[in-house]
Amino acid sequence: MNEKRLLFKDRHFTCSKIIGRRFACFAQRLSHRRKQSQCDLLNESTGQLPTTCSSAASNSINWNCRVKMTQQMQNLHLCQSKKHSAPSSPNAAKRLYRNLSEKLKGSHSSFDEAYFRTRTDRLSLRKTSVNFQGNEAMFEAVEQQDMDAVQILLYQYTPEELDLNTPNSEGLTPLDIAIMTNNVPIARILLRTGARESPHFVSLESRAMHLNTLVQEAQERVSELSAQVENEGFTLDNTEKEKQLKAWEWRYRLYRRMKTGFEHARAPEMPTNVCLMVTSSTSLTVSFQEPLSVNAAVVTRYKVEWSMSEDFSPLAGEIIMDNLQTLRCTITGLTMGQQYFVQVSAYNMKGWGPAQTTTPACASPSNWKDYDDREPRHKGQSEVLEGLLQQVRALHQHYSCRESTKLQTTGRKQSVSRSLKHLFHSSNKFVKTLKRGLYIAVIFYYKDNILVTNEDQVPIVEIDDSHTSSITQDFLWFTKLSCMWEDIRWLRQSIPISSSSSTVLQTRQKMLAATAQLQNLLGTHNLGRVYYEPIKDRHGNILIVTIREVEMLYSFFNGKWMQISKLQSQRKSLSTPEEPTALDILLITIQDILSYHKRSHQRLFPGLYLGYLKLCSSVDQIKVLVTQKLPNILCHVKIRENNNISREEWEWIQKLSGSESMESVDHTSDCPMQLFFYELQMAVKALLQQINIPLHQARNFRLYTQEVLEMGHNVSFLLLLPASDDVCTAPGQNNPYTPHSGFLNLPLQMFELVHFCSYREKFISLYCRLSAVVELDSLNTQQSLREAISDSEVAAAKQRHQQVLDFIQQIDEVWREMRWIMDALQYARYKQPVSGLPITKLIDPSDEQSLKKINSTSSSHIDCLPSPPPSPEMHRRKTVSDSQPCSDEEACSEVFLPTNSDYDSSDALSPRDLDLVYLSSHDIAQQTLSGLSGSAPDVLQVHDVKTPLGPGQDPQGEGPNPDHSCAEFLHSLTLTGFTPKNHAKTVSGGRPPLGFLGKRKPGKHPHYGGFSRHHRWLRIHSETQSLSLSEGIYTQHLSQACGLAQEPKEAKRAGPALDDPRGLTLAHAASLPEERNSSLQDARPSVRRLYVEPYAAAVVAQDEKPWASLSPPSGGRITLPSPTGPDVSQEGPTASPMSEILSSML
C-alpha cells in the first residue's frame, strides 16, 4: 500500500513538473509574441525597424523591407544588421529592453497618439520609406548596368519619388555612375527624366580627387578584410567577413572602372545641324543635334550663347540647357530688328567643347506684321464679348424683374392647365419609333460602347411634329447651344411662352424644351457637340444628332451601355423597312459619325502650313472643302516646324507677287530666303498632288498675300487660291478637276464652329452664348412690338428692340474681325487686278514629272481624268430612275435624295456634289458587257505593272527609263463613272461592300443592280466607300474640253499628255468571290489586263527643257514623304486580240 502511495506521489510530482515546464514555455512564447507585437506597433507608428527584437526577427523584417539586391550587397547588409541588432552584453540587452518597456508602458495616451495618427501622416511615412528603397534600388540597377530594372523603376515611380538628384553616402548620383562607367543607354534615359550630376563636382580637379579618395578607401577596406580572413581561419565570423570582402572587392573594381573612364574621356566635339530660326518679334530659336563624337563621355549639358557682334565679344547672354528632352532652345527678350549671332557648345564630365555657329550665322527677331506695322487679328475680341455678355445678362435680369408681377396670375392658370395635360400625356420617355417630325438624338460613347435606353434604342426625344421643310437657320441656332448646355434652364425662363408667337420662336422654344427633357432624363447638362448636318429620310423625319465621348462607363438611371456592333445587329434584324428611317441611317453610319466627332477635336502640330481654299455653293449655303481626317481645318500640307514668318520672308513674298521676276531674286546658298523658297516650292507641289490637280491646270493658282493666318496654338497658314472664277463653284458650273477620296464638303457655318472650337475655344464659346441669346431676344422683342397696343407699350418695345439691335451690331463687328475665311474669299474672287503670288513664279507648269514623284499622304488613288461627254446609256438610265445616289460627303448622313414632294432647298446638289455623283460598279459592268462578255469584276486592284516598249525604244539601252514615272502615275488609276452632266465621282474610303451585301440576284430594277428596294439604300451608302474598276483598254483624256475626235493640234493646245505609249497591267482584286474569281481565271485567262493608251500626238515639244528646280540646301530638312513606287512586273502583255479602245466614260 505504501509503495503504491509513493508511486502515485512520484507520478503526481512528475506530471506537475511537466505541466509547470509547459506552462513556462507557453508563458515565454506569449511574452515573446507580446514583445513582437509591441515592436510591430512601434515600427508602424514611427516608420523605423525594431532594434530590440531578436536577431532573427530583426533580420527577417529588414530582409523583407528591402528591395532584392545582389549577393555581395545582401551579405554586406546582413553583417551590418547583425552587428547593430546583437547586444554587446546581457546587461546592455536588459537595459535596452527596460527602456523599451518604459516607453511602451509609461504612457498609454502617448502610445495611442503615436499609433493612431492620421492617415496622411502614416502615408507620408510609408512614402518616405518607399522613396528610400527606390533610391537604393536605382543605385543598385545603375551599378549593375541593368537597363530593364532602370526602366521599370522609372515607370513605377516618379523622379521625385526616386530622388534621382540626391547624392548617396559616397557623394554620387545615379547619373554620375552611368556617365563615368560610360553606360550611354542608361545615361540617356536618366537625362531624359531630369537626372543631374552631383553638385560636389564643381571642377575637373574635384571630380578626380573624389574618385581617388573612393578608390583608396575601397582598397584599404579590401586589404583590411583580407588580412582578417587570412588570420582567423574557418569560423562563423570569418565566413561573414569573407562575404564583406567580396562585396568590397566588387565595389573597388567599380570605382576603378569609373576612374579609368574619367581619365580616358575628352571634351565633346561641336554640335551638328545647328539651325537658327526667327520665331517672333522678340525671340529666336536654335535647334541642334548631338556631336558626331562625344569622346567616350555622354553630353550632359549644352550652352547657347548670343551676341550682337560676330566675334561674340561681348556676349549678350547665354543659356545652360540641363533638360535634354528636346534639343531646342528659345532665346526670348530680344530687341526687334537687332541682328544677333548665336553659337552652341556641348559639355561632358571633361568640360566644354568648341562652339558651333548657327546656320544662318545671324538673324533679326521679326514677324510678318512688322512689314507694314499691322495690328494682330486676334486681339481683345474675347474681352469685348465678355463685357457684352454681362450687359445682356443684366438687361435680362432687369426686364425679368419688371415683368414677373404681370405674369403671376396668367402663369398660375397656364401651369394648372399644363399639369392636367401632362397628367395624361407622359413626356418623360424616350421616343421608340419615328413618325414625321423633328427629333434630337444623343450619342454617348466610350470606346466601343454606346449608351442606349432600357428598350435598347438610342436616346431620342421629339422636338416638333409639324416642322417646316427647311430648318437650316434653326439647326444653326441649335448648334450654338452646344456651347451653353448649362444655360438651357435660364434661357427657357427668359422666353415668354405664348400661343401667338411666330413659328420660328415656337420652334426655338420647343428645341429648348426638348433639350431640357434630355438633360433631365440623362442626368447631365453636357450633351456633347452637334453633328455637322441633320439626318433626313423620305418619311419626313429630321434627326439632329449630338455626340459626346465620356471618360468612363458610369451608370445612368434611364439607360445602359451596349456594344455598338450589337446594337447595329439588333436593329438590322428587327427592322427591314422598304425605305429606311432616319434612325436606321443613324445606326448604319454611326461609325462615320463617331469618326468625324473624334477627328474634329484634333489639332495640328505647331508649324507653318499651306492650305487650299475651295468652296462650292448651293441654293442656301456655302460649303468648304476639307479632309475627312481633319475636318476642322482646310486641306493642307506642312511647310516647316517654325510657324513664324519673318519680316524678310514676308517682304520677299510681297516683292515676288509684284512685277519683280524670279530671276532677279538671289537664290544662292548663302541667301536666307533660299531655304524658305525651296520649302514653299515643295509644299505647293505636294498640295497640288493631294487635291489631284495637274500642274498645267494650276497655271492660274496663286498664294494669298494679304496676311498669314494665325489660327492659334502656334499654327499658321499660307493659302493657295484657285483662279478667281473657280474659288467658289456655283450651281450648274462645270468643275474641271476632281479631288481624291477622303475629302468632305462641310457647310461654312459648321466649319467655322468646329474650327474655332479647336483653335479659339474661349472666343467661340462666348460668341455662341451671346449670339444664341441675342437671336432669341430679337425674336421676343419683335413679338412684343407686334403685340404692343398703347403708346407706352410701343415705346418700351421699340426701346428694348433697339437695344437688342445694338448688341447684334456689336457682336457682328467682332465676328467679322475674327472671320478670316470671308476676307480670304473676297480677296480670292477679286478679278481686277489679279492679286496674289502666281505659283508659276515658284514652279514651272511644264515640270510635270517632279510632281508625279511626290507621294501624296492623303490618298493612294490617283484619278485626274477630266469629265468626258455624257454617255447615252447613262442618260437613258438617268431618265427612268426616280432617284440617284448622293455625294460621298452626304452619304454618311443622308443616304438618298428626297422626292419632289418633300424636297428641301438645302438638299440641292452643288456643282461639287454633282461632281461626286457616280455610277455604281454594276452600271460600269453593264456598259462593258459587250466588250468583256460580262466577265468584268466589280472591284479591281492594281497588283502588277508592266510598261511595254514603245516604237523606237531600245530594250538594251542603259539610260534612264522614262516609263517608270508613268508607271508610278498609273499605279493607282481608278475608273469612275460619269453622270450625264459631265461630272466625275470619286470614292471615299476603301471598305469593300461585297461581303456585307452578299451575292447579287437578278431583280426588278436594273438601275440598282438587282437589289430590292429595302436593300437599295444600304448598297448606295456602301458603294460610296468602295472602288470600282472594269477591265479593258482606256484612253486618257487631255483636258476638260477634249473629245474623242479631237485633232492633234487641238490636243496640243489643250494641255500635255503622257510622253510615250505605255501599258498598265491590272489583276483581279482579292475581294472577289472565289467562285467568280476562279471562273474568270479558268474561262478567260487572257482577259486580265488593263492598258492605257494616250493620244498619238505629242503635246509638249521634245526640245523644251523642263525648268530645273533647286536642290535642297545644306542643313535644310524638308518634311515631305518619300516617293514609293509600285512593284514593276516583268511579265509581258498577253497576245489576246484586244485592239479596240474603250472610251474613258467607262
Swiss-Prot record:
Region Highly conserved peptide sequence: start-end pairs: 607-614
SMART domains the record matches: ANK (SM00248), FN3 (SM00060)
Assigned GO CC terms: spindle
Gene, per the UniProt record: ANKFN1
Span list, region Disordered: 855-887, 945-964, 1106-1146
Protein name per the record: Ankyrin repeat and fibronectin type-III domain-containing protein 1
GO terms, biological process: behavioral fear response; equilibrioception; establishment of mitotic spindle orientation; locomotor rhythm; regulation of establishment of bipolar cell polarity
Tagged with keyword Electron transport: no
UniProt biased composition (Polar residues): 1131-1146
UniProtKB keywords: ANK repeat, Repeat
ANK repeats: 133-162, 170-199
Function per UniProt: May play a role in neuronal function.
Positions of the Fibronectin type-III domain: 270-366
InterPro entries in the cross-refs: ANKFN1 (IPR039269), Ankyrin_rpt (IPR002110), Ankyrin_rpt-contain_sf (IPR036770), FN3_dom (IPR003961), FN3_sf (IPR036116), Ig-like_fold (IPR013783)
Keyword Membrane among record annotations: no
PROSITE patterns to which the protein is assigned, alphabetical: ANK_REP_REGION (PS50297), ANK_REPEAT (PS50088), FN3 (PS50853)
High-level lineage: Eukaryota, Metazoa, Chordata, Craniata, Vertebrata
